[in-house]
Amino acid sequence: MAENAGLENHRIKSFKNKGRDVETMRRHRNEVTVELRKNKRDEHLLKKRNVPQEESLEDSDVDSDFKGQNVTLDAILQNATSDNVVIQLSAVQAARKLLSSDRNPPIDDLIKSGILPILVKCLERDDNPSLQFEAAWALTNIASGTSAQTQAVVKSNAVPLFLRLLHSPHQNVCEQAVWALGNIIGDGPQCRDYVISLGVVKPLLSFINPSIPITFLRNVTWVIVNLCRNKDPPPPMETVQEILPALCVLIYHTDINILVDTVWALSYLTDGGNEQIQMVIDSGVVPFLVPLLSHQEVKVQTAALRAVGNIVTGTDEQTQVVLNCDVLSHFPNLLTHPKEKINKEAVWFLSNITAGNQQQVQAVIDAGLIPMIIHQLAKGDFGTQKEAAWAISNLTISGRKDQVEFLVEQNVIPPFCNLLSVKDSQVVQVVLDGLKNILIMAVDEASTIAEIIEECGGLEKIENLQQHENEDIYKLAFEIIDQYFSGDDIDEDPSLIPETTQGGTFNFDPASNMQTKEFNF
C-alpha cells in the first residue's frame, strides 16, 4: 500500500509521466480487488473429496463383514494388514467409507491411528487393483482436508506411488490417482512444484484423448487448473509450455465443466506477469478465448473475462492482440449484464484499455463504451463505480485533448465529482487526479470546466477535502482550488472575492454569475 501511495503521489506531481503511468494505471488483480479474488476461490475448488452418490452392489458384497457392527479403528488397522485378501480389502474399504462420510470425516483419527503407511503400501499391490483403488480413494479424501492433513499424505511418500499408478492398466485406478494428485497439487506452490519435479505433467496430459470418459477428463482438467494456479512463485516456465497446447485443445470442448476449468487455467497463467502473458498469446489461444465473452453460460463468461482482463494488464502490444480480436464488441452486453460482478470485471478490463496508447483509447470511444462507463460511474455498485473512476482517470492521462473533451461532453464531471465524498481514499485521489488532468487539458477553457465542477457541487467537496487526513489528498485539493478557483480577475471585481473560513479555506457561492460558454478545448 505504501508503494501505491508513493506512485499516486508521483502521479500528482507529474502529469503525463508515461514511465509511471503504465505502472499505476494498468492494475493487476491486487489488494484493490481482493473481494473478487475471494469470489473466484469460492467458485473454484482447490481440493475435492470423493463422496459416492450411492454404494454399488459390488461394494456391499465386499464389506459385508463390517455391516451391522460398529467398526473400530483398531479393527480396521489390524485387518488392513491381514494376509487374507478379502479381509484386507474390506478393512481398507471400511476406512475409505469412514473418510467418504458426508459430515466430519475422522481424518485426524485415521492419521493418528497409523493407517497412512498401510494405505500407501497398498498402492504397490499391482496384483490387487481393487485394493489399490480403495487405498487411493482413502488417501484422496485424507489429502482433501487441511494443509496439515495433505502434508501427512505427502510425508508418507505416497506421491511417487500415485505417479506410478498413472500408468496402471486399470482406468479407475488411474483416475483415482489423478484425483489424489490434484488434491496434493492444490495444497499450494510447494506441493505443486514437488509433484511437477517428479514428472506428473506428461502422463497427466496423455489422458487427454477422444476415448477418455467425460468424468475422468473433468478430473484431469481440474488438476491442470491446480498446476496453473498460484503465482508466488508461478509454475515453472517449462510446465507452462507443456500445458498450453493441451489447453488449446480443451478450449474446444463442449462440456461446460471442462470449458470453465480450461479458461480458469488460462486466467491463472495470464495472472503471472508479462512473460507468461506472452506465452499464452504465442500459443494462439486468444482468438478462441475472446468469443467466450458472449457464451451463454455465465461461468464461462466470468472466466473468459478474467483471462482477457489479465492479458490487458500487460504491455500495449499484448493489449493490442486482444483488441485485434474484436473484443470490444462484446462489452455493451457485459456492461449491462444483470450480474454486478460481470459489470465490475468489464469496467476493470476497460480501465486497462484506457491506460493504453491513444489509439487504444480511441477504440473504446469508437465502440460507444464511454457513455456506458459513465453510467456505471453514476449508477453502479460501489465496486463498479471504483473501477469506472479508474477508467475515466486513466483516459485523462493517456488520452489526447479531443478524447478528454469527448469525456466532458458526455457529462462525466457530475458523477465523477459525486465520488469525492466517499470514504475510500484511493477513489477520492483517483477522481481528484482525473479532475486536475481535465483542467490541465482544458487550458483556456479551464474556467468552463471549473464552472461545471462548481455547479454540480464538486467545488464544495474539493474544499472539504482540504481538511482530509490523507496528505496527498488535501495537497491535491488545495492545488486545484488554488490554481482553478481562486480567480484571476478578483482585483477587477471585488464581489467575486469568496469569504474565508477560520481554517483559511474559501467558501464559494455556487450561484456566482459566471458567463456560460460552449465547451471546446
Where are the regions a protein language model picked out?
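Intrinsically disordered, low-complexity regulatory regions
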Residues: 1-84, 89-97, 459-521
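Short sequence/structural elements of tandem HEAT/ARM alpha-solenoid repeats
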Residues: 70, 108-114, 151-157, 193-199, ...
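Cysteine-rich, disulfide-stabilized extracellular repeat modules
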Residues: 106, 138, 149, 158-161, ...
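Flexible helix-coil junctions and inter-repeat linker/turn elements that act as hinges
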Residues: 104, 116, 144, 148-149, ...
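Alpha-solenoid helical-repeat scaffolds
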Residues: 60-90, 94-98, 103-109, 117, ...
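Alpha-helical solenoid repeats of the armadillo/HEAT superfamily
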Residues: 83-97, 127-143, 155, 167-186, ...
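Short, flexible/disordered secondary-structure transition segments
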Residues: 52, 56-58, 87, 105-106, ...
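Buried hydrophobic core positions in alpha-solenoid tandem helical repeats
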Residues: 75-77, 118-121, 161-163, 203-205, ...
